[in-house]
Amino acid sequence: MGGASFSRAAKRLVSPPCVLVSKGVPRQAVLVFADEIHVDLARRSFPKAARPLLDVAAVGSEILAAVDIHLFTSARKQTAPGFHIHRQTGRDFAARLENAIERISELGYDEVVAIGRDCPGLRAIDIERAFAELATKKLVLGPDHRGGCYLIAFRSAERELLRGVRWKQNTDCAQLRDRCGDGQVFLLPVKHDLDSWADVRIFARGDDPLARLALFLLAAIYAAPTRLVHFVSMACQRMRVRQQMPPPAFAA
């Protein structure tokens, strides 16, 4: 992280969200909704070496200082320079997301861009474009390759559009478009999110700078002996043969 980026991030960390803004200028926030990084890695059977693929800190460091970043996480203790940290609350994904949206609205933000951590191709310029398009649209959606969304931008005054959505059905994008009607939704370019090794293979074929890391991880997986591949593919990676060591690329 460069000096300028670090200064911006440090400023966000020590400064609470400011409620005084120029008249007519909307208050903007980025809502990052994510579990602890080790939980997200284990859920996908990804090794620690894949952490950069699920890292939102790089995007956060590029976002304009005028935009506050709020991380809603399941972690009991979380530090993220430049992020305002909140605990997720709710019985399921939908409730936790809706509660996060309500909290952001209570803090006085007019425009919100909600993202996760599983889209390595997401860039700060995508977030800036989303805020810009909210001037004329009810929603700005970033569709993923399966029909979900890697980004949802909305005005707090119209957050009811997000209530009752059947999330995680790969129909999120279609549901939200249907709710708004023609001409009220702006679509960003389709990007790939990473929920499985199959997604990593697709992502590795692209020209994103992180695609090289994806290729490296795939090469390490397929070069390993069969018994080690079985170990890597286990959901929580908790079982291993006595005295069996993980592949070098996956060592802690």
Where are these regions (language model features)?
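N-terminal nucleotide-binding beta1-loop-alpha1 segment
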Residues: 10-40
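A short, N-terminal amphipathic alpha-helix
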Residues: 49-68
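Short, polar loop motifs at secondary-structure junctions
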Residues: 72-78
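Short phosphate-binding loop-to-helix
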Residues: 81-112, 169
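Active-site acidic Asp-centered loop
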Residues: 115-117
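Conserved donor-nucleotide/metal-binding helix-loop-beta segment in metal-dependent transferases, i.e.
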Residues: 122-146
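Short, glycine-/small-residue-rich phosphate/pyrophosphate-handling segment
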Residues: 155-179
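Conserved alpha/beta core of the MobA/IspD/sugar-nucleotide pyrophosphorylase nucleotidyltransferase superfamily
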Residues: 174-252
